[in-house]
């Protein structure tokens, strides 16, 4: 929803082939950074002409300076404040050092200069993330600004025109948006629900046009019933089971100490992990297109050279990628190995 209400330096958009890519939004272009002698990297952005807030105030480069320092500050304690750690000066700002500021400046109303602590390959991706959106300084001085459409000042393709708390948020096209000609839907009604059964019922009866969750037990049928509409979207993340066990998991009568004890406990933890049938979990329980995890770092996270991290994280001559062999045909062998380890320590 924030992407409808705010506009940042950059944005995600579809290119001519339909693939998602990052394009300039409030900025005229996304230039290459300049490498400084001390290893820092400086980027200079020029804002487009005529940018305004929804209340008519001009949008200035200083709005980004304020918003980024606010989001990174210890005083705000924002969940995503850490995303500014790539910018020089972040540690002092995050730790609440008096007078500390991020290395972000606005020499004039249309120029934004930011210096990163070092080279960052994903800098443009950060610029397109909602945490990097600007906020209207005078508006956010009131903590309640974001809970009422009458005080919700934004700069995106839509404004908030209605909010029935716990029910519906209504967005209306922002005619003063810098790219308003490309905004084709005059109104978006966002129904608030955390009930997947309710979501699906409203989609089926035509009340809602888009939903982002369905009951797990309906997935198989929906793939057949709505072959074009039902889409499983990728998401980078790892779900895991956390065992509530003591730090020392060796039997009480074990005589192992020091490095030997640590090595043994690592073997035991690995053995427990091998007992999980990951394929059964994703295919029979989750059913949402998840894939078995062979490392804690999810598929989709890449090394600087573009290779998948999980494939190189545990480089061995084994026939599988990652730390565990998660192929279906390997499960029986995994269990045998796990039981062998557990039998060695628990007799």
Indicate residue ranges for each PLM-predicted region:
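N-terminal lobe/hinge region of extracytoplasmic solute-binding protein
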Residues: 1-36, 153
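Extracellular/periplasmic solute-recognition and catalytic clefts
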Residues: 161-172, 189-252, 279, 283-285, ...
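Aromatic- and charge-enriched surface segment that lines or borders ligand/interaction sites
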Residues: 28-80, 113, 202, 259-263, ...
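Append "and occasionally in soluble cytosolic enzymes with long acidic Gly/Pro-rich linkers
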Residues: 263-347
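Surface-exposed binding/hinge segments that line
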Residues: 44-46, 63-65, 76-137
